[in-house]
C-alpha cells in the first residue's frame, strides 16, 4: 500500500476512534493531525540533531503530518479488565536524543531517537543502529531502564498500535501485548482487548436495555449511576443481578476495583441486598474479599440507617479499644456515607491532629450550629477541624442547620484567630469571616 494511502487510512481510523470514545463518555483530548512539514523545516531539524531522518520518517513528516497527538482515558467507573489508556504521537520538534539517566552519556543515547514521551516519562524510540529506511520502534521504561520492542518498523508499529486503539505511551500499556516481533495483535490478550474495546465503542444503552447480559456488560463499562440504567435493571429479578456482582467480587484480582462492584450492588439492587450485607459482618469469604471501608459503604447504603450506623460505630470503637491509632482518613472512609449528625457526637472525644479526614467527616455529617459552636469552643484539634469543615461547607454552598448565635460565633472566631499559631490557621479564620455576610443572608 502506498505510504500516503496508508497514512490517510490511519487518520480516518484515529478520527473514528476518538469520535466513538467521546460518544461513550471516555475522556478524550483534541485530536491533533497537523499539516505536513516543509522540506526546509525537516532539514533544519536534521541539522540540529546532526543526522538525516530515516527515509520513511522523512516521508511521513513530508507527506503525512508534522505532528500527531492522540489521547484518551476511560472513566473512573469503567471496569476495564485491562486498565489501558490511549497515548500516541509524534512531532517534528519532538524528535530528540534521549537521556536515560546517569552521569555519563550512554552509547544508547546516540543509537535511539525519541519521538514521543509518555505522561510518566517513558519514551517511544526509533532504533537508528539498524540503518534501515523504516526503523524498529521500542518503548523505554524510565523506572526499569528496559527496552521493549513494539514493532520491527515504524509503520508496523503505527499499524499495530492503531489496531489496538492507540494504547500507550507508558510502557505498562504494552507489556501484556508485546511479543518477540513487537506488539502482537493476534495473541489471546490482544484479541480479548480488541473485542472489549469494540463493544465499548459501539454498545448503546438502547441495545443493552433489551438484553440482561448486555445490560450487565454496559453497567460494567459505564457504572449504573444513571437512573435510566437503574430503571432498566428493574425489569429483572434482583437475585440474579446480585449474584452477578457477588461472583465478580469473588473473582476480582485488583483490589482497586472492589469498590466499583460494591457501587453496582448499591445502584442496581439497593436495600434488597440487606441480607447479603448482614452476612458480611459474619466471618466468611465475602468479608475476606472486601475491606472494612467497602463493607461500611454497603452497610450505609443497604441496611436501615440506625442498624448500619451502630454496626460501623461499634467497629470503630473496637479500633479505639485496641489502642490503635484512629486517624481521620480511616474514620471518614468508614462513616461519611451515613451523613448522620450522630457521627459528630461520636467523633468528638476521638479527634486529634492531623485534622485531614476529620474535617471532611464533620462537614458531611449534617452539623447544627450548636455543634459548630461547641467545637469552636473545644480543644485545639476540635477548633481547627470545625473551622476547616465550615470552610468546606461554605465552598459547596452549605451551612449548618438550626439557629445561628452570631454573637457567640463572632466571639469564638476572634478567639480562634488570637490562638492561631500557623499562618494557615489564621487564613482559615479570615476565609470564614469574609464569607459570613453571605451566610447570614
Residue ranges and their predicted role:
Residues 1-122, 174-175, 191-202, 206-214, ...:
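A surface-exposed partner-binding patch
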Residues 118, 127-205:
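Long, contiguous interaction/recruitment modules in multidomain scaffold/adaptor proteins
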Residues 164-168, 336, 365:
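Short loop/turn hinge sites at secondary-structure boundaries
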Amino acid at each position: 500500500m502506498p505510504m500516503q494511502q496508508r497514512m490517510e487510512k490511519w487518520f480516518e481510523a484515529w478520527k473514528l476512534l476518538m469520535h466513538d470514545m467521546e460518544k461513550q463518555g471516555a475522556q478524550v483530548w483534541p485530536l491533533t493531525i497537523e499539516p505536513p512539514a516543509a522540506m526546509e523545516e525537516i532539514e533544519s531539524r536534521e541539522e540540529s540533531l546532526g543526522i538525516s531522518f530515516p527515509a520513511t520518517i522523512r516521508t511521513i513528516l513530508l507527506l503525512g503530518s508534522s505532528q500527531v497527538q492522540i489521547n484518551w482515558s476511560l472513566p473512573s467507573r469503567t471496569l476495564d479488565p485491562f486498565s489501558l489508556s490511549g497515548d500516541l504521537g509524534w512531532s517534528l520538534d519532538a524528535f530528540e536524543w534521549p537521556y536515560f539517566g546517569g552521569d555519563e552519556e550512554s552509547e544508547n543515547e546516540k543509537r535511539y531517537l525519541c519521538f514521543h514521551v509518555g505522561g510518566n516519562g517513558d519514551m517511544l524510540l526509533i532504533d537508528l543502529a539498524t540503518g534501515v529506511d523504516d526503523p524498529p520502534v521500542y518503548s523505554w521504561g524510565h523506572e526499569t531502564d528496559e527496552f521493549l520492542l513494539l514493532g520491527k518498523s515504524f509503520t508496523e508499529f503505527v499499524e499495530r498500535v492503531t489496531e489496538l486503539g492507540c494504547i500507550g505511551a507508558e510502557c505498562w500499556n504494552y507489556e501484556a501485548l508485546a511479543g518477540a516481533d513487537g506488539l502482537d495483535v493476534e495473541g489471546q490478550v490482544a484479541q480479548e482487548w480488541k473485542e472489549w474495546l469494540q463493544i465499548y465503542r459501539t454498545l448503546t444503552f438502547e441495545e443493552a436495555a433489551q438484553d440482561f447480559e448486555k445490560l450487565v456488560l454496559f453497567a460494567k463499562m459505564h457504572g449504573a449511576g444513571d437512573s435510566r440504567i437503574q430503571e432498566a435493571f428493574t425489569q429483572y429479578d434482583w437475585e440474579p443481578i446480585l449474584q452477578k456482582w457477588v461472583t465478580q467480587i469473588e473473582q476480582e484480582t485488583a483490589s482497586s476495583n472492589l469498590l466499583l462492584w460494591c457501587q453496582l450492588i448499591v445502584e442496581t439492587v439497593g436495600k434488597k441486598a440487606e441480607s447479603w450485607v448482614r452476612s458480611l459482618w459474619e466471618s466468611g469469604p465475602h468479608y475476606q474479599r472486601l475491606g472494612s471501608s467497602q463493607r461500611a459503604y454497603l452497610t450505609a447504603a443497604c441496611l436501615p440507617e440506625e442498624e448500619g450506623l451502630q454496626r460501623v460505630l461499634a467497629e470503630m470503637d473496637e479500633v479505639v479499644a485496641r489502642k490503635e491509632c484512629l486517624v481521620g482518613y480511616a474514620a471518614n472512609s468508614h462513616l461519611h456515607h451515613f451523613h448522620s449528625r450522630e457521627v459528630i457526637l461520636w467523633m468528638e472525644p476521638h479527634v486529634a491532629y492531623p485534622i485531614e479526614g476529620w474535617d471532611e467527616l464533620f462537614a458531611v455529617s449534617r452539623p447544627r450550629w450548636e455543634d459548630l459552636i461547641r467545637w469552636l469552643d473545644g480543644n485545639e484539634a476540635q477548633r481547627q477541624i470545625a473551622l476547616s469543615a465550615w470552610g468546606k461547607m461554605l465552598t459547596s454552598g452549605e451551612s449548618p442547620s438550626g439557629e445561628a448565635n452570631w454573637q457567640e460565633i463572632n466571639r469564638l472566631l476572634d478567639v480562634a484567630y488570637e490562638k492561631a499559631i500557623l499562618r494557615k490557621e489564621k487564613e482559615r479564620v479570615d476565609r470564614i469571616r469574609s464569607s459570613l455576610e453571605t451566610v447570614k443572608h
